[in-house]
Amino acid sequence: MLLKGAPAADHILATIKENIRACSKAPGLAVVLIGNNPASEIYVNMKIKRATDLGMVSKSYRKPSDATLSDILALIHQLNNDENIHGILVQLPLPKHLDAQAILSTITPDKDVDGLHPVNVGKLLLGETDGFIPCTPAGIVELCKYYEIPLHGKHVVILGRSNIVGKPLAALLMQRHADTNASVTLLHSQSEHLTEITRTADILISAIGVPLFVNKEMIAEKTVIMDVGTSRIPAANPKGYILVGDVDFNNVVPVCRAITPVPGGVGPMTVAMLMRNTWESFLRHTS
């Protein structure tokens, strides 16, 4: 089974759009882009377009790659104090000279729609429900719900321990909720017996950014695979490349039970969760 993200995302976004239409005021989303990373440009434009399509007021704030930390923090403080902005997103990755954690920690937690502020991370770890959950982990859980893939009691193996996906995803999946409550194993570049462990997974989620890393030898029959990775590899086409995931798709499809495509799998869900967090932030600020 192919786990396409668009149908699940469209279902969520349609509800948000309907709710916004019923409001006299629109949610405001600020997207901060620093530098000229081509991939980041694409992601930012996609998020802004999606927000606008839903009826949100979406603004982009662009800073040059040599912007100073003080410049960025001043902008964040400005957005924190703007009553018309309900969600603030700083597009990652940042130029190397900037301290990402310092910037993310400056966003007020109740506008941190990416869910990366230490307060929201802490609430996730504690199982509290009034924080914002990082968008990709939340999107994966929603994708499982849409396709009726149970997580409760299942062994979920996560490849990758990033602060954006791996760690918060592990924390989310272990929560004592009907939609989660999984047994989680988190693997990384220093993990031993990798294949031996991945073959025990009911659900394998890869978020390492290594193209075509996961092959059929690493999974058991009827494993569900969620591929978070997106990489470019050279190809003989007009673009000169194709997008692939962490998983060797054609290699594992005959063996696995279900798999997300790249592109078109987890990606649309990440954007949908950003929109949902922005909507929820709007409700909290206007209630």
Swiss-Prot record:
Q: Which PROSITE patterns match?
A: THF_DHG_CYH_1, THF_DHG_CYH_2
Q: Name one GO cellular component term.
A: cytosol
Q: Which reaction does it catalyse?
A: (6R)-5,10-methylene-5,6,7,8-tetrahydrofolate + NADP(+) = (6R)-5,10-methenyltetrahydrofolate + NADPH; (6R)-5,10-methenyltetrahydrofolate + H2O = (6R)-10-formyltetrahydrofolate + H(+)
Q: Any idea of its EC number?
A: 1.5.1.5, 3.5.4.9
- Show the Pfam families listed in the entry: THF_DHG_CYH, THF_DHG_CYH_C
Record SUPFAM superfamilies: Aminoacid dehydrogenase-like, N-terminal domain, NAD(P)-binding Rossmann-fold domains
Instruction: Tell me the Gene Ontology biological-process terms attached to this UniProt entry.
Output: L-histidine biosynthetic process; methionine biosynthetic process; purine nucleotide biosynthetic process; tetrahydrofolate interconversion
Please describe what this protein does: Catalyzes the oxidation of 5,10-methylenetetrahydrofolate to 5,10-methenyltetrahydrofolate and then the hydrolysis of 5,10-methenyltetrahydrofolate to 10-formyltetrahydrofolate.
Subunit structure and binding partners = Homodimer.
Say which family it is in. Belongs to the tetrahydrofolate dehydrogenase/cyclohydrolase family.
The protein's name: Bifunctional protein FolD
Species, as recorded: Chlamydia trachomatis serovar D (strain ATCC VR-885 / DSM 19411 / UW-3/Cx)
Q: Which gene encodes it?
A: folD
